[in-house]
A protein has these predicted regions:
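Eukaryotic partner-binding/assembly regions in large regulatory complexes
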Residues: 1-79
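Short acidic, hydrophobic short linear motifs in intrinsically disordered regions
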Residues: 33-42, 111-129
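Short amphipathic alpha-helical interaction segments
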Residues: 46-54, 135-152
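Short basic alpha-helical hairpin corresponding to helix-turn-helix/winged-helix-like nucleic-acid-binding
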Residues: 55-116
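A short, conserved structural fragment
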Residues: 61-67, 147, 151-162
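Short, cationic-aromatic polyanion-contact patches
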Residues: 77-80, 161-186
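Short, amphipathic alpha-helical interaction segments positioned at domain boundaries
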Residues: 87-88, 173-208
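Exposed, interaction-prone assembly regions rather than primary DNA-binding/catalytic cores
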Residues: 118, 126, 140, 193-217
Length: 217
């Protein structure tokens, strides 16, 4: 079995640069999503072709990778170690993430064959209303910030330059790994209980379940 140094030496100088780029991208954004653009496509296939090297290298700093057949590379904490880093969302951001996750899964389970899964702001608002937290948050002022945060981690994309009538939210396959069904059910129950007991300005923090290495400012 080849060692990390042997696998590294087998790479060309240009491939070594791509390797470093992929590692930086995963540590910064958690996901590489093949279908975002050509740059991400190249990185996805490079990671897939060198999965052993990435796994061995990232294990040294407490991480591992998962390569999915649907075109997603995901960085995760090594289960054998303590949590290295965790992105934390406030309650409102966590609720939006759950709503987007639900919309994505509904569209997939309904048999959508579209290469790009999208949703609209009216669809998202309708899903948000199911949580019955009207008045608890200023939705308009916080929604854009939450969506921009999710875009940072390659979960979604929103073309903010489009007109209101044409603006859609692209849901990347990576969003399905931000929550699984059991975690989603547990989260919803907990949120509804807290929302019933919380005041209008409550900003409880809820943890998501994917890992993200924060950059130093």
């Amino acid at each position: 079995m080849s060692t990390i140094n042997e696998m590294w030496d087998d790479l060309t100088s240009s491939e070594q640069l791509v390797f470093k780029k992929c590692c930086r991208r995963l540590l910064k954004e958690t996901f590489i999503v093949r279908d975002i653009d050509d740059d991400n496509r190249k990185m996805f296939f490079f990671v897939k072709s060198n999965e052993g090297l990435f796994s061995d290298y990232l294990n040294l700093i407490g991480f591992d990778i998962v390569v999915r057949d649907n075109g997603v590379v995901m960085l995760q904490n090594n289960s054998a170690d303590v949590v290295v880093s965790k992105q934390r969302f406030n309650k409102f951001q966590s609720i939006i993430l759950c709503c987007l996750w639900t919309l994505y899964m509904d569209k997939i389970q309904s048999g959508s064959l579209s290469k790009q899964i999208t949703t609209t702001f009216p669809e998202l608002n309708a899903e948000l209303e199911k949580f019955e937290f009207k008045g608890a948050f200023d939705v308009k002022s916080n929604l854009k910030n939450a969506l921009q945060l999710f875009a940072r981690y390659n979960l979604i994309f929103v073309n903010w330059n489009a007109s209101d009538n044409e603006r859609v939210i692209v849901l990347y396959p990576s969003i399905q790994f931000a929550l699984d069904e059991s975690e989603f059910a547990t989260f919803v129950i907990g949120v509804r209980e807290r929302m019933m007991n919380a005041g209008p300005q409550s900003e409880d923090v809820a943890e998501d379940n994917f890992d993200a290495e924060e950059e130093e400012e």
